[in-house]
Amino acid sequence: MNSETPAAGPQQAQPPATLTIASRESRLAMWQAEHVRDALRKLYPACDVKILGMTTRGDQILDRTLSKVGGKGLFVKELEAALADGRADLAVHSLKDVPMALPDGFSLAAIMEREDPRDAFVSNDYASLDALPAGAVVGTSSLRREAMLRSRYPHLEVLPLRGNLDTRLAKLDRGDYAAIILAAAGLKRLGLEARIRALLDVEASPPAAGQGALGIEIAAHRDDVAAWLAPLHDPQTALAVEAERMVSRALGGSCEVPLAAHAVWRAGELYLTGRVSTTDGKRVLTAEECGAVVTVADALALGRAVSDELEAQGALDIVQALLAGSQAAGKGDA
C-alpha cells in the first residue's frame, strides 16, 4: 500500500511497549520529533518512546541547491532505510519535504494538524519585501520562492540559501543577505516568531504543497503502528494536503519546478489554488477550484481539476522544459 492518507484505525489500539521515531538531527526536525514523541507519551504513558537522530544527504550537501543534487528525497531516504530495517517504527517529516510519490513499501500513517502554511519575510533592516532597495540580496532555498521574487520584485537579487534554520538565520545576521524567505511554521515552532517581519499573503505567494504540516511515515506493512498513530491524524489537514499534493504529483512536480499548491477550508468547502512558474518569473500560471470534500477521493479529484486547468494553460511545457534543463545541468556537474 502506498496511500497518502490512512484509513481510520481501531478505536482502542493495544498500547505498544516501545516506539522509535526516526528524525533528522536539525533543531527544527528534533522539535518536530519531540512534538510527536510527547503526543505519543500522553496517549500511551507506559510506552518507551525514543528518538533516533540521523543525518541525511540533504543535510550534508550544502553547497548546491536541492534541485541540482537529487531533490527532496535526500531528506527522507535514510529515515526510510531505518523504517525498512526495523531500527525505527515511524519517521517524522515536514510534509513539504516529502516527495509527492512515496516509494513502494512506505505510507503516511498520520498527518497532524497544520501550523501556519505561509512564507515569512525575515530581515534585520527592512520591514517587508516592498521596502527593499534595488539590488538588495534576498536568500531562499526554494525555486518556488525564487520565481515569485523574480516575478514580483525583478529589481532584487535572488541568491540560493541552504542549511538548517539556524544556519540560514546566521547567514542573514552576518550580512550575507538583506533578507531571507523562510517557512513561517518552522520559525513559530522554534519560538522564533519575533524574527518574522512580515507574512507573505498566500494569494501573492502560495506555499508549497503540504507546507506547515507534519507527516508521519511508516513501513506500509506496519498496521500496528498505523493503529497507534491514528489519534494523531487530523482529517481536515489531511484532505487539504492530499489535494495540494495531487496538483504537484499530477504535473510531475519536484523541487526542480516552481510549483505551489495551497488549500484552505471556507464555509465547509475546500478552496484550492495551484501555481506553476518559470524560474525567471516571467510566466506564471494560476488555477483555482473549490468544492465539497469529504473523502480522500474528493480531495484527489479537486487536485486533479486544478492540475488539469494548469495543463490547459501550458503548465506541462514549463515543467518538462525545467526538468530537461535540470537533467542537463546534472550531467554537467557529474
UniProtKB/Swiss-Prot annotation:
CDD domains, A to Z: PBP2_EcHMBS_like (cd13646)
UniProt keyword terms in alphabetical order: Porphyrin biosynthesis, Transferase
Domain of life: Bacteria
Obligatory cofactor(s): dipyrromethane
GO BP: protoporphyrinogen IX biosynthetic process
Molecular function, one GO term: hydroxymethylbilane synthase activity
InterPro entries (alphabetical): HemC, Porphobilin_deaminase_cofac_BS, Porphobilin_deaminase_N, Porphobilinogen_deaminase_C, Porphobilinogen_deaminase_C_sf
Keyword Transferase appears in the UniProt entry: yes
Reactions performed catalytically: 4 porphobilinogen + H2O = hydroxymethylbilane + 4 NH4(+)
Protein purpose: Tetrapolymerization of the monopyrrole PBG into the hydroxymethylbilane pre-uroporphyrinogen in several discrete steps.
Assembly and oligomerization: Monomer.
NCBIfam families, per database record: hemC (TIGR00212)
Protein name: Porphobilinogen deaminase
Species the sequence originates in: Burkholderia orbicola (strain MC0-3)
Gene that encodes it: hemC
